[in-house]
Structure formats: structure tokens, C-alpha cells
Amino acid sequence: MECLMAVILAAGEGKRMKSKKAKVVHEIQGIPLVEWVYRSVKNAGIDEVVLVVGHKAEEVKEKMGDKVLYAFQEKQLGTGHALMQAQEYLKDKDGYVVVLYGDTPLITSKTISDTINYHREQANSATIITAVLNNPDGYGRIVRSGDGSVRKIVEHKDASLEERNIKEINSGIYCFNIRDLTEALKELDNNNSQGEYYLTDTIEILINKGKKVGAIKVEDSSEILGINDRVQLAEAGRIIRSRILKRHMKNGVTIIDPDSTYIDEDVEIGIDTVVYPSTIIEGKTKIGEDCIIGPGSRLVNAQISDRVEVKNSVVLESSIDNDTKVGPFAYVRPGSVIGKNVKIGDFVEIKKSVIGDKTKISHLTYVGDAEVGKNVNLGCGVVVVNYDGKKKNKTIIGDNAFVGCNVNLISPVEVKDNAYVAAGSTITEEVPEYSLAIARSRQTIKEDWVIKKGMLRQEKE
């Protein structure tokens, strides 16, 4: 049975990244570089994926989990040596293997699929993914024979003047016949100035054996961009962001200013939703239809239903149901569940709380560790005092309750259904249903106090 595999090389140190982390776990739009490569491989229909790890191997394994097979390169002795560490998975197999790098996040599943199909159709022993660059300086050139097959790969420093004029370059990504590759790896040596085993030498070995080596040009040369430093990381991020935004726009989402909008790969957005400038949508956020998001909002792993507005606000790991309005300048913290037709207004903070349908929390309010019922009104300046210095306590506010301005609810406490709390109160005990709670001192008037105390304020001439 024909086998289809991929080997992703991800063992390098990545010194130019100047980072404490492994290069391939640096993220673009919420996904590690190596995960981008893995997803493209899987979407191309390849089920068996081997990841060659080395530098900070445990960190890479933690990110990738058990969805890949692992090979370990103890010493970084070149790309060919890295591939040699995966030989146990190639042994005695017939079929094809795609070899690519964990720091090439822009490679697409279409390019991988096209390469495999071309490799089969041409009956190649190896197929190289190539690109045409206006400025190919520093890259290995593809020298073709008259029939279009690859005659050799010549490195820039070794190329003649005529060869340096060739603009087709080697991407370093290949499709091999597995049996031909395993035989070529047996002949690979490190007889060079660096003392390393080069993957490109396998191509020379196959050509010298009379095997057919072909090349397929990638349509977009940015796909082969390798990430070696933070500048290239930012450039790849710009390209991936553009792809993501275009996909959403083609699927019926309006994005007012793509240049200032950041949306992670796993975000889902329904049709006719409008995303305003300076908005960041991260993680596995899911947004329904006909929503207004932004300007200046940040959503992380949020679940947003239909016709919701989130303006100039932050929503973290929480859900918001249909027809609710949030903001401006609201903060919905993790673990919150906001119902339908709710208003969360300016400078309101909700933390790990449930807010019932049709409830209004319009401004300057903190609600933490609380259950707030349906059709409740919390006035300006209400504070749920949930922390006693040792632990967080729960507050329950029943349906149709009314809590006036500048009220402190000292948790644990309960305001029953249909109860009222007068403005300025500090509530420490249960407020029964249909009752009014007043917890403030009576107002005292001292007549002529200002004159008697000499406190009269007069404008200076």
C-alpha cells in the first residue's frame, strides 16, 4: 500500500531569533510556527507526520502534543543529519515523503498537494519546490536540463556568472520517493568545510544514480520564507494576517480597516458582522452574525452570539448572548456569562459572573463572583464587594431587582426577586422580596454652620 508521509525538521537553535524559546514555538496569530506547517501538511491529506526535534525539544513537544511522531537530533549536524534521525519511520515503506522545515509557516496545503501530484505524474525520484526571485542572491540556483528536469543545484558562492543569472531558486522543501531517499541517505557524508550533512546533497546523489529529479515553481514566493529573526517573523505575520482577513471578508464579514485589525487563525465570524479599526480578536473566539465589534476592542476566546455590540471594550473567555450591548470601555473578565438584551455600559467590570436577560448595568460598576437575575437594574457606582481578604464570596441578585447608585453589596449576600436597594446603602444582610433596603445614616442640616465656622468661600478680587 502506498504511504504518504511528511517529515518536519524543527531541531535548530535559531540563534538569530535571540530568544529563550525554541524558534519554532514563536507564534503568528496565536499559532506556533511549527503548528502552521503541520496544519498545511494535514490539510494536504498527509496523515503520518514526523517531527524532528533537538534544541529545546521538550518545549516543542509540549506545544505539539501527541498528534505527531517524534525523532530526536541530539547534535545539530545539518539538515541531512536531521532527516537521517527520522529513518526509523521510513524503513521498508513504499510511497512518498514531503520534507519541509518547521520555520516556514507560509507554505500552503495547496502547494504541498500540487507538489505531491506533480511528483506522481512525472514519476520523479525527487521533486523540489522552487521559486523565482527578482533578487536571488544568496540562494542555491536550480539548473535544469533541456527536458525541464533538474540537472543540479548550485550554491550562490559556487555558481558561475551564467548560473548566477538564473532566478529560480531552491526552497529546501522536497517530495521524495521513500525508498530512493533512504538509499541516498546511506551515501550522505559530511566531507565539507562545515562538517555537516546537507539535505541538498541527496539531490546530487539521486541525479548521479540516474534518478529523475524535477522541480515545481510555487506561485507566491512568500510561501517559502523561512523565519530566522524577529524581522522575518513580523513579515510572515503581516502576510498571514492578510490571508486571514481576506478569508473573512470573502465569507461576508466587513473589516473597515484591515491594516489595524488583528484576527487569529481559529476565530470564527458570522456574515454581516462589522469589525471596526484597532480591534484584536484572539484564540478560538466565535462571533455570530450581524455583530458590531470595535473600534478598539479585544476579544480572547470569547463566544459572541448574534447582533451583539462590543465597542472599545475587552471580553476575555466569556460568553455574550443575542442583542446585548457592551461598552464603551467595559471589561468582561474570564468565566462570565452575559444573557440576551443586556446592557453593559461604560467603565463596567464583570468578573466570573452570570448576568440575566434584559439586565442593565450602565456605568461605573463592579460585579464579581455574582449571579444577577433577569431585568435587573444596577445603578451607577454599584460595587459587589466580593473579597474579604482571604476568599472570594458570592452575591445573588434576583430577577427584577433594583439597586440604586453608589451601593456596596458586601458578599456573601442576597437581594431577592423584586427587591429595591436605596442609593448610598451598604448592604450586609439579605434583602427580602418586595422590600426596600436603606442602609445609610439620615441627613442632618446645621443651619448657618458655614458662617459660624468662618468657612464662607468668596472670590478674591
From Swiss-Prot:
One of its GO terms (molecular function) is glucosamine-1-phosphate N-acetyltransferase activity. Its EC number is 2.7.7.23, 2.3.1.157. Keywords: Acyltransferase, Cell shape, Cell wall biogenesis/degradation, Cytoplasm, Magnesium, Metal-binding, Multifunctional enzyme, Nucleotidyltransferase, Peptidoglycan synthesis, Repeat, Transferase. Acetyl-CoA binds at N386, Y387, A423, R440. GO terms for cellular component: cytoplasm; membrane. Pathway: Nucleotide-sugar biosynthesis; UDP-N-acetyl-alpha-D-glucosamine biosynthesis; N-acetyl-alpha-D-glucosamine 1-phosphate from alpha-D-glucosamine 6-phosphate (route II): step 2/2; Nucleotide-sugar biosynthesis; UDP-N-acetyl-alpha-D-glucosamine biosynthesis; UDP-N-acetyl-alpha-D-glucosamine from N-acetyl-alpha-D-glucosamine 1-phosphate: step 1/1; Bacterial outer membrane biogenesis; LPS lipid A biosynthesis. The keyword Zinc does not apply. Pfam families: Hexapep, NTP_transferase. GO terms for biological process: cell morphogenesis; cell wall organization; lipid A biosynthetic process; peptidoglycan biosynthetic process; regulation of cell shape; UDP-N-acetylglucosamine biosynthetic process. Its main location: cytoplasm. UDP-N-acetyl-alpha-D-glucosamine binds at residues 9-12, 23, 73, 78-79, 101-103, 140, 155, 170, 228, 333, 351, 366, 377. Residues 231-251 are annotated as: Linker. InterPro entries: Bifunctional_GlmU, GlmU-like, GlmU_C_LbH, Hexapep, NTP_transferase_dom, Nucleotide-diphossugar_trans, Trimer_LpxA-like_sf. Binds 1 Mg(2+) ion per subunit. The active site is at H363 (proton acceptor). It catalyses: alpha-D-glucosamine 1-phosphate + acetyl-CoA = N-acetyl-alpha-D-glucosamine 1-phosphate + CoA + H(+); N-acetyl-alpha-D-glucosamine 1-phosphate + UTP + H(+) = UDP-N-acetyl-alpha-D-glucosamine + diphosphate. Homotrimer. In the N-terminal section; belongs to the N-acetylglucosamine-1-phosphate uridyltransferase family. In the C-terminal section; belongs to the transferase hexapeptide repeat family. HAMAP family: GlmU. This is Bifunctional protein GlmU. The lineage of its organism: Bacteria, Bacillati, Bacillota, Clostridia, Eubacteriales.
